[in-house]
Curated annotation (Swiss-Prot):
Gene3D superfamilies: 3.30.420.100. HAMAP family: Ribosomal_uL18_B. Part of the 50S ribosomal subunit; part of the 5S rRNA/L5/L18/L25 subcomplex. Contacts the 5S and 23S rRNAs. GO terms for biological process: translation. Belongs to the universal ribosomal protein uL18 family. This is one of the proteins that bind and probably mediate the attachment of the 5S RNA into the large ribosomal subunit, where it forms part of the central protuberance. One of its GO terms (cellular component) is cytoplasm. It comes from Lawsonia intracellularis (strain PHE/MN1-00). The lineage of its organism: Bacteria, Pseudomonadati, Thermodesulfobacteriota, Desulfovibrionia, Desulfovibrionales. The gene is rplR. Keywords: Ribonucleoprotein, Ribosomal protein, RNA-binding, rRNA-binding. GO terms for molecular function: 5S rRNA binding; structural constituent of ribosome. This is Large ribosomal subunit protein uL18. Signal peptide: none annotated.
Length: 120
């Protein structure tokens, strides 16, 4: 399967998922973006269209943590987004895998967020 068709299928899955899930200020949407070098996680309030919190392997590297975008690094990103959310009294979230399969790095972010104290 070519890269173009793989990305096109992911975009169709993304649209299908976004029709069903919705984040609010009390229960924001945790969105995952995966690139070859980094993984990003952000909490989004869909009512106002604003990003409440964000973290990534890139921001953790800036803080002095030696991290890569593998499963262990993704778990750390999940724990960090959970820590930041709990500081803002956000406990419940809606998980948006952004069209990616719930496997590998995406699952590791979700598991890290659960370990950090977030409820899906």
């Amino acid at each position: 399967m070519s890269i173009k068709s793989k990305n096109k299928l992911r975009q169709h899955r993304k649209i299908r998922i976004r029709k069903k899930i919705f984040g609010t200020a009390d229960q924001p949407r945790l969105v995952i973006f995966r690139s070859n070098l980094h993984i990003y996680a952000q909490l989004v309030d869909d009512i106002t269209g604003s990003t409440l919190l964000t973290t990534s392997t890139l921001s953790l590297k800036d803080n002095g943590i030696n991290i890569r975008a593998n499963k262990s690094g993704s778990t750390l990103v999940g724990k960090e987004i959970a820590r930041l959310a709990i500081e803002k009294q956000i406990i419940k979230i809606v998980f948006d895998r952004n069209g990616y399969l719930y496997h590998g790095r995406v699952k590791a972010v979700a598991d890290g967020a659960r370990e950090g104290g977030l409820k899906f």
